[in-house]
Amino acid sequence: MAIQSKYSNTQVESIIAELSAVLDKHQAPTDLRLMVLGNCVTDLLARKVPAEARASVAEQFSKALAQSVKG
């Protein structure tokens, strides 16, 4: 069963394109891109998710990421 998102594909793809353009501008190799994006996720969790929910949200995020790369 597909997961329904409250965000449109257009909105998501637009943000991805902008983030990718910034990484391209800096000629960031794959490992640096992953490091930067991971640090962004960590910062977002620290600033926007209550402390008591962070571990759970991080776990859900990591599971979704792992599932998305399985194809």
Swiss-Prot record:
Q: Which InterPro entries match?
A: UPF0352, YejL_sf
Q: What Pfam family does this protein match (any one)?
A: DUF1414
| Superkingdom, natural source | Bacteria
Output the NCBIfam families linked to this UniProt entry.
PRK13689.1 (NF010242)
Which family is annotated? Answer: Belongs to the UPF0352 family.
Would you tell me the protein name for this molecule?
Answer: UPF0352 protein Swoo_2786
Q: What is the lineage of its organism?
A: Bacteria, Pseudomonadati, Pseudomonadota, Gammaproteobacteria, Alteromonadales
